[in-house]
């Protein structure tokens, strides 16, 4: 976790789970809000996943990703077990190293190299906010395919960071004005660059097909 910038950690918590350090794997406030929305809409529209629940899905694929109450129950049970076993910092580190950022990348380090061509420790605040903005739907907010959407989503993350005290109003205005500098195509490395590129493109097609 020491190699991941503090502002990246802050951006994830501000955007994905603001009560991360206060709950035990399940946020009762989020559950109550989600239940209210689902009852009013007479359907399953609002989820209530904490960071730990998201990690549970990432680590244990048998939990599944479908929108159902059964999946949520399995997810919550696994999340509570994770919270009992690991510290909050360990959970955050595992999450950041396994979460999907789109374009065939998993984890902050791989995503930073894919979009910016550098190491995660070199990320600026606005760059971290853009990467975190991808998490709800990497295909929809891809800075390569949908730069306008990506910028708006990045600004939403920056606003959340400002509102929760992670950055000042002046910093928010400064970072919000930054243009996107995503790297479209990185030079291929390794002994089989064309095969690697072929696999990467297959993964990107899967992302688009699943809208993730």
Predicted segments with their positions:
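A short N-terminal beta-strand-loop micro-motif at the entrance of redox/enzyme domains
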Residues: 1-5, 82-84
């Amino acid at each position: 976790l020491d190699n991941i910038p503090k502002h990246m950690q802050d951006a994830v918590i501000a955007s994905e789970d603001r009560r991360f350090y206060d709950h035990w794997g399940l946020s009762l406030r989020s559950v109550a809000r989600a239940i209210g929305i689902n009852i009013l809409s007479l359907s399953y529209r609002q989820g209530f996943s904490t960071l730990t629940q998201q990690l549970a899905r990432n680590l244990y694929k048998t939990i599944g990703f479908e929108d159902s109450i059964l999946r949520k129950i399995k997810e919550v049970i696994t999340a509570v077990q994770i919270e009992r076993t690991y510290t909050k910092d360990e959970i955050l580190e595992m999450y950041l190293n396994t979460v999907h950022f789109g374009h065939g990348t998993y984890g902050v380090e791989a995503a930073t190299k894919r979009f910016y061509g550098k190491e995660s420790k070199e990320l600026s605040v606005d760059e971290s906010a853009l990467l975190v903005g991808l998490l709800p739907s990497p295909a929809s907010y891809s800075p390569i395919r949908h730069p306008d959407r990506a910028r708006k989503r990045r600004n939403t993350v920056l606003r959340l960071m400002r509102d929760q005290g992670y950055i000042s109003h002046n910093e928010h205005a400064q970072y919000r004005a930054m243009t996107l500098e995503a790297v479209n195509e990185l030079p291929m490395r390794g002994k089989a660059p064309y095969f690697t590129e072929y696999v990467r493109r297959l993964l990107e097609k899967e992302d688009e097909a699943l809208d993730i």
